[in-house]
Amino acid sequence: MKILRGSPALSAFRITKLLSVCQEQQLPVNDIYAEYVHFAEINASLSDVDSAKLQQLLKYGPSLAEHEPQGTLLLVTPRPGTISPWSSKATDIAHNCGLSQVVRLERGVAYYIQSGEMSDTQWQILSSLLHDRMMETVFTQLEQAEKLFSRQQPVPLKRIDILQAGRSALETANIELGLALASDEIDYLMDAFQKLGRNPTDVELYMFAQANSEHCRHKIFNADWIIDSQAQPKSLFKMIKNTYEQTPDYVLSAYKDNAAVMEGSAVGRFFASAENGSYDYHQEQAHILMKVETHNHPTAISPWPGASTGSGGEIRDEGATGRGAKPKAGLVGFSVSNLRIPGFEQPWEEDFGKPERIVSALDIMMEGPLGGAAFNNEFGRPALLGYFRTYEEKVNSHNGSELRGYHKPIMLAGGIGNIRDEHVKKGEISVGAKLIVLGGPSMNIGLGGGAASSMASGQSDADLDFASVQRDNPEMERRCQEVIDRCWQLGENNPILFIHDVGAGGLSNAMPELVSDGGRGGRFELRKILNDEPGMSPLEVWCNESQERYVLAVAPEQLPLFEEICRRERAPYAIIGEATEERHLLLNDEHFDNQPIDMPLDVLLGKTPKMLRDVTTLKASGESLERRDIDLAEAVKRIMHLPAVAEKTFLITIGDRSVTGMVSRDQMVGPWQIPVADCAVTTASLDSYYGEAMSMGERAPVALLDFAASARMAVGEALTNIASAYIQDLKRIKLSANWMSAAGHPGEDAGLYAAVKAVGEELCPALGLTIPVGKDSMSMKTRWHDQGEEREMTAPLSLVITAFARVEDVRRTVTPELSTDEDNALLLIDLGQGKNTLGGTALAQVYRLLGNKTADVRSAEQLAGFFNAIQQLIAEQKLLAYHDRSDGGLLVTLAEMAFAGHCGIEADISVFDEDILAGLFTEELGAVVQIRASDRGFVESILAEHGLADCVHYLGKAQAGDDFVIFSGNTEVYRQNRSTLRLWWAETTWQMQRLRDNPACADQEHQAKQDNQDPGLNVKLTFDISEDIAAPYILQQVRPKVAVLREQGVNSHVEMAAAFHRAGFEAIDVHMSDLLSGRIGLSQFQTLVACGGFSYGDVLGAGEGWAKSILFNERVRDQFAVFFARPDTLALGVCNGCQMMSNLRELIPGAEHWPRFVRNRSERFEARFSLVEITDSPSLFLQDMVGSRIPIAVSHGEGQVEFRNRQHLEMLESNQLVALRYVNNYGQVTENYPANPNGSVNGITAVTSLDGRATVMMPHPERVSRTVNNSWHPDEWREDGPWMRIFRNARKQLG
């Protein structure tokens, strides 16, 4: 084993934070230094050249400290016996660089601790602060890392002796293995194996427990019900299915696949030909698939991997729909207990305690959103929608006074995708079809996730809880998705017959489900499964929940094609069995020469005992809302700090919102980029205005008083949100229903039934809405002991509705951004029929009250009329702005609209004279619309036509300035500066950013929000945006070839190819594996573009591993050197491609002074819509654009320029090789965050070579080359955005 020192692992501010935590734990630690250490397992000695190559390969990140570290060593490494995602990717890079002697690379962090005298207990506390026990271990000597490369022998299976010991043996196994089997299931298994005449193996029992867990089988939703001694006619699931029976319109697949599918639009889908790699548009139906999952249990235990794998699993569900589909855009949601931010605690936040094994709500929200965002970012899926709610209180609900809150959190992950018409239905599995696992190797992780998540937190063993959390490797999932994409793009020749994702229960659930759904059985070989931990037992190999895996059936004759696709994409796969005629499962283990599984499928998936729920209805007593102590001004301030209301920038800018080049409406609205969008909208393709919309609705606190009203309100809110998109037909909207409940808690079961009935049997059929997909999580309770007393925290019944719809024209989406350009009017459309209830509202929550009467859907007919009226007004282009009434009520609706428009409001609420407080803070359904004053009569007549005449109230108008004033008649009710409200609203996000990210950056961003004179994003163009300078060359019908270059993990190549294609190029898909294998050479191309993403998951530095695989491979290095030297070529590097090409500067003439691109100053992935200025440089891509100031999409974690010395910066500047700089909204070059999202010196974000043929930039022009994909743009822009000029300039240069 070779040991090689690496770069510093923690920045100064991270060390300061760590020292501060040590102080809180009363540890006498004086200083900490941390650096990466690399361990190389080699099977032959390295030559001097190869040693130098390895040293160079592992030189990345900030410069290595010159001094020898001082202090006591604590070395944190991956758990021995595991192989980390970092290891597998770094090893891949080493092999691609020709270092075949390297068996494996691994990395640890060496912490050098300088401290006073510490006890063993204190060292253990410090150790626990430095590592994650699920994934890591701590050594005290570098040499101990040798254990990382130890090889363990496989552990044999166990048999449970029920034939001799009887039922008690099964009961003991149930506890020891954490199976969570019910008594009748134990009876079922006893009977089944006695009939088979043998003892079950531990593998069979574990597989049965996972496949039949509540998590996988949804027993409660399929149960029979007796409520108040009355047998109920339908199960919960049948009531949900009733929505489809009543309104099957536009639904193509429901209830029987990994995601539901509805009818989409006929558009041109853009992808590369399998024959020659040439990209083009393919006219076809792009149907819409939808899915929303939860990952609550793992997120409570370990938030980052819990949320990350939650998103990853949902993405796999989409990709594994039908015979293969394409995930497109995502959403996330979180419900947690109170944050209690240190030093920023709020008046309504009381500490009720929690069990040790789960993390705090604050830690969940510090880590969980980062995990979810990181997976989406690295996979390449924009995260465009979400919700965030906190609740934790002692309230008088259905079961009397008790603690209600989210110690067991909700972590929601969902999204949309597209699928071809011929692939919606899965194929048949033929006898003899090859059964394949696509994706990464097995590891001893995620065991028992299905069973563990089916229990209330606190019921299972703590070690089992930790074992049930998975690890993430999104770059691996991206590779698998590329394989799936290549397959579905083959149309009728798609080799995938059947596909499922591997989720809860691992292969033990996925493979039986695959063969059973295909009408077959299966014969498998355990040792064919890719395995990174050979010491695992058969149970662990078969049942672990290692992520990023799919199971597929492929016909034998199609196998060579499938294997070739996998090899090109470097996606691991294993053929582990074949389908059999007999519906039987046989798993052979050639190592031990036995059969861990040998059972009929009917025993595993047959008619296990059906659940019966015999429950009683309880009425919530509630209490009248005591308002004597509520001061209006104080109420506003409190509500602005409630997380459900407050600004959520800290949850949004961590997530890429522009990848795919098909995002039309993200969360950020207007020139000031305020996160208040009502819904998310994508284009159906890269050349269309058809699209898809998503919105969310949830009203969980209402359920503490009225279960059914809470469910109806969730549907209603999702509708009032999605109404801002142009959908036309209400029946086009399809819903996902995610139900979270503490089943078995007094009153909750009957309440769940009432809520499902209200939605499935009544409201949705009345509206013509269908719920073709959903999920349930029935164990939303946490138990623990505190000083000998048992305590419980029970979540409210929580229904999260996600609405999905086809969009007729994405350009018609209306946002909350107010306009003051003309005389205007603000109208409130009140669907609450003047009830103005306050039970379960934000106002009640911030005063620690509950109330007794809640908002509700007062009339399904009026709600439908509202949607139809808004659609008509959008079609007539009569709405200037739109925002629904939601958390915080009317006052928050108006405030958020004012924030988006950076303007004042003057509103008269005399309609609420009877109860002004209720009028301002009720959360009854409704919306505020801004219209031209001259259109008021017409708009009111349209609303009246749809039965809303009595619901419409004129409020006032938006006006320039900072005054936010509310009157009741002539009496001033409330006055505050809009800028002050904006800062209150932003303080939660500021405090969270300060804790989580670089506090200096958080402070700068908060300070920027205090600038009331900020003009917002603005545009200055020095060229004619409407001129197509490539048109004359396109008319020649000669398309020069551009190599659209990608490495494993790159995710922005399709939108890049589309931009070049539009400019008149023939875009060719070129994978690095094509160059390394010699399938393709660069000599045939005049233009090369290196695309964005996460090559090798950014291990060994962003883009550096990709670059070194070129620099250290002689044949490929020569190809690039020759290409860059040719005077007739152009080269562009964007984002990850920019980072990669900056490390190839020794090959690029005139690029010797280029910088490297390193970690952002915020130390966070930054997704922003940033303003840049095009500077005077030789860049051929930016010709005739000099002096322009244009917003552009930014999405990166490592974009800060780092020069080797000051002279290199000076040479770059003096030679005018800086091509783009970040500027603030005043047009000044800036290093301030967030106008400069990475902290680059002199605002540098693009550089070019001396002759201008090679340009690299961190922002993404390809994602915003169409106007419709800009988060904000001037009204006069038409089809093309200004960044399209880059690609047309390239075409012009080639003549």
UniProtKB/Swiss-Prot annotation:
Protein name as catalogued = Phosphoribosylformylglycinamidine synthase
Q: Which UniProt keywords apply?
A: ATP-binding, Cytoplasm, Glutamine amidotransferase, Ligase, Magnesium, Metal-binding, Nucleotide-binding, Purine biosynthesis
Q: Which GO terms describe its biological process?
A: 'de novo' IMP biosynthetic process
Q: Which gene encodes it?
A: purL
Instruction: State what this protein does.
Output: Phosphoribosylformylglycinamidine synthase involved in the purines biosynthetic pathway. Catalyzes the ATP-dependent conversion of formylglycinamide ribonucleotide (FGAR) and glutamine to yield formylglycinamidine ribonucleotide (FGAM) and glutamate.
Enzyme kind, highest EC tier: ligase
GO cellular component terms listed in the entry, alphabetical order: cytoplasm
The answer, when asked if Nucleotide-binding is one of the entry's keywords, is yes
On subunit structure and binding partners, the annotation says: Monomer.
